[in-house]
Amino acid sequence: LFTATLLYHVNRVFAQQYVTTEPLLKNVLIEEFTGRNCPGCSQAHLLANNIIKKYPKRVFVSNIYGFDTPTYPNLVTQEGNIITHALGATAYPSSQINRSKDSADLGVSEHDVNLFIKQEAPCNIGGLVVVDELSRTATITVEIYYVHDSDNDVNYLTVEMLQDSIWGYQNNGMNNPEQYVDGNYCHMHVFRDIITSTWGETISPTNEGTLITKTYTYIIPEIIGDPSGVDVNINHLKFIAFVTNEMIGAESRPILNVARLPFLIGTQEEVFPCIDDISYKDNSMCSNSKSFTIDM
């Protein structure tokens, strides 16, 4: 009985590879509803950027584009439209902070960010994204560790792909000089796709001490948007994962925690190193220790 109990606790606490088991404060996701033709949106981008600078690695932004004509760069997506309508965005710019309200607020509320950033998170999120550049295959591993019990027996895990550095038109882009160069605007944190279902994959159990690991294989599209789509540059991608508490109406909210997943461009093929040659260094020296050069 003692042995079985010991192994059980080892598996629960030490099986994780990426996520910490220590209590942490909540991170924040700003879902910003924006558009290239929106006259006030560049200022909202600037405000969101300043919040990111204030809370590095704690605040993340997903810019969901609407309010646009289908000209290049067409940043509107079907999934983005579903989220926009469900989260109550009826004007631009507007935002949801951790999906905490029935409808989106105008602009970006730093006040709401400040509230959430001080709260303890019920769960921590970690993981890794490895992309095989040749096949454009992303292998996404997400770990969720529950530091405290969730309010619900079932939560929802969502993984999103965002893209930086998409150049194109932005109404009043000069109001955000950080992203405006020679009349061209650099669109950042652009929502591109959801790897899970729109409102997340169900995860359980959600009680304290539970570790959940999910792995996804995703083929990164060459282009997103129709018509006037945008090339999906692998080097400009980032992936975020967040956990929501429950389904309320058609959407899952509020967000319990969010994290950006580390991103590597590499291969999933196994590597088998072999020794090709071994040679002595300074082999004329008399000593009990030897130095070797090994070619692999």
Label the predicted regions.
Residues 1-21, 159, 267-268, 272-275, ...:
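Bacterial Sec-dependent N-terminal signal peptides
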Residues 18, 226-230, 281:
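Generic recognition of flexible, low-complexity loop/linker segments
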Residues 19-60, 64:
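Local sequence-structure signature of Cys/Sec-based thiol-disulfide redox active-site neighborhoods
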Residues 32, 276-287:
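Short, solvent-exposed loop/edge segments of extracellular or virion-exposed proteins
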Residues 41-44, 277, 289:
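General secretory precursor processing signal
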Residues 57-271:
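Short, conserved sequence motifs used for protein processing/export or organelle targeting and
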Residues 131-136, 282-290:
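Short, solvent-exposed loop/linker segments at the N-terminal edge
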Residues 295-296:
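Acidic, Ser/Thr
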